Amino acid sequence: MPDIRLIALDLDGTVFDDEKRISARTLQAIRAALDRGVDVVPATGRQAGGIPAEFLQMPGVRYALTANGASVVELASGRSVVRLPFDDALAQQVLAAVQPFGGVIGVFIDGACYGDPASAARVESTCPPALLPYVRASRHVVPDMPACLA
């Protein structure tokens, strides 16, 4: 059997179903991995504060990979262990490149997510209903995304 030391689990639509529930089978598998000494790490586009309590309350879950992979957070302390921010100029270039496509744009800055009003409106029409309360509570709407990045 391979020596597995870490399991990183996507949350939305994978560990959690569209109703934000974890199946009994998935919980059992996570607990079995933790009991074997495997580090189980939630991996998510969310910021650390948006990881559902059901996952955080599992003894042995110590870290989270957040902000679409740009940050690793120690859950007990909230301390950032790894931060991989974009260079400011590159962030501006990426924003300018994706804005014309009209998708949902969220920019993470110091653990918070920011988006413009048009992006916030698109979230309302595209987000799974069970996820909307989290998205509404965790996103900050700003009138000017380039200025937000400056």
Q: PLM features: residue spans?
A:
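Short, small/polar residue-rich loop motifs at catalytic or cofactor-binding pockets
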Residues: 1-3, 59
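Short, flexible active-site loops
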Residues: 144-150
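A structure-centric signal for secondary-structure junctions around beta-strands
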Residues: 3-4, 67, 102, 148
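Acidic, His- and aromatic-enriched active-site or binding-groove loops in soluble protein domains
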Residues: 122-144
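Asp-based phosphoryl-transfer active-site loop
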Residues: 3-19, 94
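Active-site phosphate-binding/coordination module
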Residues: 24-127
